[in-house]
Structures are given as structure tokens and as C-alpha cells.
Amino acid sequence: MNSAVDTICARATAVGIGAIAVVRISGPEAISIVSKCFSKSLSKVDSHTVHFGIFKSANGVALDEVLVTVFHHGKSFTGEESIEISCHGSPYVQQQILDALVITGCRMANPGEFTQRAFLNGKMDLSQAEAVADLIAAQSKKAHRIALNQLKGNLSSDLKVLREELISFASLIELELDFSEEDVEFADRSQLKDLVSKVLETVNKLSSSFALGNALKSGVPVAIVGAPNTGKSTLLNQLLGEDRAIVSDEAGTTRDVIEETLNIDGILFRLIDTAGIRETNQNIEAMGIERSQQKIKEASIVLCLADASDVNNLSETQTWSSKLTKTHPDKEIILLSNKSDLLKNDVEEGISLSAKEGIGIDALKSEMVKAVVGEMDLENDTIIANARHHEALIKTAEALEKANTGLHDGTTGDFIAMDIRQAMFHLGSITGDISTDDLLGNIFSKFCIGK
């Protein structure tokens, strides 16, 4: 497909005051339009060259000293003739440059239009285009790595292999349908069963990685829970390395939920210090406890904090932790025995620590990372972090399950072929091999303008 024939422009850097800013132009008239506002002609310069000069308004008034970088057709991010203007970071100067470009023949770009043109011009597939937005929004090392791997085409390569296998499968089934009257079987059913099972296993593996990918992308919610005065706020402060929560000997000091972020080994954790859970007659504290219960439901990891110096509290917390493990199998429940510095011997269950003295904090951090990553290799494994991709993989798996059932039940080839085509369609929707205008509009509208 070819992109729109007009030439677009927008800020490529964030709005606001800075040392420099970049204005991006892309389209068939990019070089011609900028040349009209620049102090020298750019029509014969080489691609990937940088030129210093004065940028002028449509009336010829000098606006700024700028650097202009030229990219020829087929050699730019969008695949089109493109220019990037590096100017001083004054919002006024940026706007004056944009105004001059619009008067001279540019149109202001829509959100994500530069990346959309890159997709339409075959510079990247749809999953790579979405990775651009994820790369910009990445808040941690691991989220950055997942987005970068996707941008490099790791996911695209995996899906290409799967689609090629399904195409090979479908072609044999379709060939049988063409010769149905001759009762010829081109495809060995046992081999087809093995192929579908193999593809289905890979699709399910990719799909199951979404929980990890989404957590790494959005931050892993961690609820710190326990009875009043067990040291939850002290633990939060120790993990953060600062006094964020009020610490007091008085039970019920924390009456609301406190949320902070913590980066451990490149993984972003969203720590939630909750109100101590106990029976209370005070309305404000009761509201805090109710919110604590809700945060437990929302968390991926629950840190159950016990006061190891209090035998009754330790026993109750151990029992409660075991119940949470059974009632919330989708969550990682970690039992923590706090105030271990007051004991002669370590507690056998859970992690022994002293939030006050910082003892056991490194062990806790390691356990939190292990709870998130498990056996996954974040550097090399393909991990799904996009909800649209996850939904498409689920639909792919459903279609393959139907095909697999049909093969085992002796279903006729036309129904099996239909299921395989559905699986291919959903896989293709991830990379954009199969897409609709509505889908593209929804995806690229979420990008920032200038990207």
C-alpha cells in the first residue's frame, strides 16, 4: 500500500522549553517545501546529510539558526522523502517554524501518522509499529528490552514461521478439496495432527507470556499486607530507601493506601502499603481496611507481613498466607517474618527479615524478581506485552483447537480448512498482513503526534 500523497509536519520532541527541539517533515514535497524556507537549496544534497543555515518564515523573516537533516525517498523512517529540523527549544520558535511549513504546503500530522506511513510503506510490520509506542513509554529496563526486541522483529519472525507452517497445511487441505470427487488424500492425517499440535503449543506459549509482559510493561502491583503494627510502613520505607510512610508504635497509623514505585533489576514494581487488617469500630480506619482488601485482589504479588516476635500474630499470618495461596492461585504469596532481629533463631517459614535494620531485604527483592520472571529468559525469549496481540493469539489457539479436534474426529477437510484459515487470519492481524482501516486507525491514534 502507498501512503497519502500529501506532506506532513509535526514536533518530534515534547512540547515545552528545552535546549533544542526537532520538527519532522515527511512526504513527496518535503525537500521542496523546506528549501523554500531555508537559506540554501536542498534539492541536490545527498541523503543523510546535515546542513546549517537560517530558517525563514513564509514572508522571508529569519526565525532561527537550525540544522537540517535530509533523508531521501526509501531511506527514511517513513520510507518517504523526509527532513528533520533541529532548532532552539523555544515553544514560540517551534510554532513559528510549523506555521511557516503549513503556509508553504505542509499539513499538520495526525497522532502516529509518521509511524503509520512507515507501516504502509513496508518499513515495518504492525507489531513493530506498535513497539515504537511501547519503546517510548517504557519505564524500566525490562520493558525497554521487550519493546526493543519486538521492534527488531523477534515477534514478527516467530509469527512468520507459524504462518508459513499453517499455509503449508492449508494448501494440502485445499488441494484435497479440489480433487474431492477423486477421493484423493494429499495430506497425511497423522502428520497434520502433529503439525497443528506443534503450532498450537507455540501459540499457547506466546499467549501465556502476556501476564509477564503486561506486568513488566505496566509495573508489577505488590500489596504489603498484615495486621496493624507488624512493620508494613517500615518495610515500604526500607525498600524505597526513604521515609515515605509514617511509622508509629500506635496501631492503625496507616489508614489509607500508599502507592510508590520501585525498580529492581530493571523491573518496575508498584508497591502498595495497605492499612493494617483487623476488627475496628473507627469508620476511617475501616474504610482503609476495605481498600486494603481490594488492593490484595488487584495485586500480582502479596507480601504477608508477620510480627515474628508475637507468636500469635505469626501463627495467624502463616494460616492466612496459606489460605491466600489456595484462594488466589494466580498470585504469588510471599510470607515475611519481620522483627527477626528480636529472635534468637530464624523462623522456618517464609523469609526472615528486619524491616527496621534492613536485614533480609536483598533476599526479599530476589524473591520478588523470581516471582515475576520465573524461568523466562527476558533477553532472548519472545514475550507478549500487547493486549491486542494477546487477544489475537487466544483466537488463533481457539481456531487451532477446533482444527485439532476435527482431525481427531474425522471431520471433512472443508471444515478443517475453515478453522486453519481463521487461525491464519488472527495471526496475520498481529503483524498487519491482514488488517482493516478501523484497526489501523485505532492503533495509530494512540501514538503521540510527531511519531
Q: Where are the regions a protein language model picked out?
A:
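A glycine-rich (often HGG/GG-containing) alpha/beta subdomain
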Residues: 1-145, 149, 153, 327, ...
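C-terminal-of-GTPase-core extension/linker across diverse P-loop GTPases
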Residues: 2-11, 15, 141-263, 280-282, ...
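Switch I (G2) and immediately adjacent beta-strands of P-loop GTPase domains
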Residues: 52-72, 252-280, 301
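Acidic-residue sensor for enzyme active/binding pockets
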Residues: 65, 80-84, 113, 128-130, ...
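Conserved G/P- and acidic residue-centered "switch" motifs that form tight phosphate/ATP-binding loops
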Residues: 122, 229, 273
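Generic enzyme active-site microenvironment
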Residues: 271, 305, 336
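Inter-motif core of Ras-like GTPase G domains
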Residues: 285-309
